């Protein structure tokens, strides 16, 4: 750990000189990039400097104890050493946390895709419950939500819904929601009172910039058609809905939420870029995830991550074994405690890797 900290400190000093160089400032794009890199290192370097200063103070005090000093002063020095040693432990933990690699996507906006799984109409209603849960959670953070694509059922459920969440740090907290969500409850249509199990799949994708993923326009097929509502009835007299197919990967994205064909195409392209980026990232990180079987999981769409049990009023996250008996408020967006638990477990796993 110390070797890495020394490397970061040296790099920070080099960058301090570079960003003060007038010739480097002439290239604004490069200068801003270096300034960001410098700023990202500042906290860890400041903490490391304090860590070294505290260690030095301990050594200085120990040297003082070797001298012939009065008992009262000796007691004070020994008390100082105790406090400083406690501070060293605190700083070591802080440094370990700061050394945990940050996900470069953490500050980005996200696309959330919810699809009804096994369970027919009941699964579609559960998908609608999850959509409401995430929009309510977004409201608690003052994040904005915006529908991209909606396939609604006649009874108010969703076969599929894709929506965007805009806000600082949205991906850092919502990324843990990818996977299969399972619900156990008695459907309104069930006369015998038998509990049914249904599922919905959630995919959370970071919004990507053009520089993150390149798409060859020749690899795309764009189809336009008239937007439809419940039961397929036409709700628009123009071909405003857009379907984009990425031929090499077979990915298909549709968007009909906007009245303008151009806006629907822009939204669909954003979703397509995020899906392609997610596909590439999943392939890249597959070997890492295999080497270190994380409790929090890999974000695999097929991984059953959580159960919502209505009769018992509980929600259980199977990745960390956490059960909360507050299902009603949880589905109203009160999911912070669960997400904090997932973050804590992931951070502790990463800290083990550093140690």
Swiss-Prot record:
Methylated by PrmC. Methylation increases the termination efficiency of RF1. One of its GO terms (molecular function) is translation release factor activity, codon specific. Keywords: Cytoplasm, Methylation, Protein biosynthesis. The modification N5-methylglutamine is found at residue 233. The keyword Cell cycle does not apply. Gene3D superfamilies: 3.30.160.20, 3.30.70.1660, 6.10.140.1950. GO terms for cellular component: cytoplasm. Its main location: cytoplasm. InterPro entries: PCRF, Pep_chain_release_fac_I, Pep_chain_release_fac_I_sf, Prokaryotic/Mito_RF, RF-1. It is found in: Cytoplasm. Signal peptide: none annotated. Peptide chain release factor 1 directs the termination of translation in response to the peptide chain termination codons UAG and UAA. HAMAP family: Rel_fac_1. Belongs to the prokaryotic/mitochondrial release factor family. This is Peptide chain release factor 1. It comes from Clostridium tetani (strain Massachusetts / E88).
């Amino acid at each position: 750990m110390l070797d890495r900290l020394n490397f970061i400190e040296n790099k920070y000093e080099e960058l301090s000189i570079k960003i003060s160089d007038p010739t480097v400032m002439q290239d604004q794009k490069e200068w801003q990039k270096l300034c960001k890199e410098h700023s990202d290192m500042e906290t860890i370097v400041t903490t490391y400097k304090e860590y070294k200063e505290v260690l030095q103070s301990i050594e200085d005090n120990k040297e003082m104890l070797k001298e012939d000093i009065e008992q009262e002063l000796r007691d004070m020095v020994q008390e100082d050493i105790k406090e400083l040693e406690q501070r060293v432990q605190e700083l070591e933990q802080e440094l370990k946390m700061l050394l945990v690699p940050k996900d470069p996507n953490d500050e980005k906006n996200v696309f959330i895709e919810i699809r009804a799984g096994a369970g027919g109409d009941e699964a579609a209603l559960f998908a609608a419950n999850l959509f409401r849960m995430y929009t309510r959670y977004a409201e608690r953070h003052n994040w904005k939500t915006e529908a991209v694509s909606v396939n609604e059922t006649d009874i108010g459920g969703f076969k599929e819904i894709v929506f965007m969440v805009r806000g600082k740090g949205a991906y850092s907290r919502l990324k843990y929601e990818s996977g299969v969500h399972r619900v156990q409850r008695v459907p309104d249509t069930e006369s015998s009172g038998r509990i049914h199990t249904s599922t919905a799949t959630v995919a959370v994708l970071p919004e990507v910039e053009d520089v993150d993923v390149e798409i060859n326009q020749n690899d795309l097929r764009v189809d336009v058609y008239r937007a439809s509502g419940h039961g397929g009835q036409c709700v628009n007299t123009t071909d405003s809905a857009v379907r984009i197919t990425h031929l090499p990967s077979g990915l298909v994205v549709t968007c009909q939420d906007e009245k303008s064909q151009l806006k629907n195409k822009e939204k669909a392209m954003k979703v397509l870029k995020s899906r392609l980026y997610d596909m590439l990232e999943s392939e890249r990180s597959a070997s890492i995830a295999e080497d270190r079987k994380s409790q929090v999981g890999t974000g695999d769409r097929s991984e059953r991550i959580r159960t919502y049990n209505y009769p018992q009023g509980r929600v259980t996250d199977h990745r960390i074994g956490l059960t909360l008996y507050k299902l009603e408020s949880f589905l109203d967006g009160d999911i912070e405690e669960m997400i904090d638990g997932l973050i804590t477990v992931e951070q502790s796993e990463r800290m083990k890797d550093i140690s």
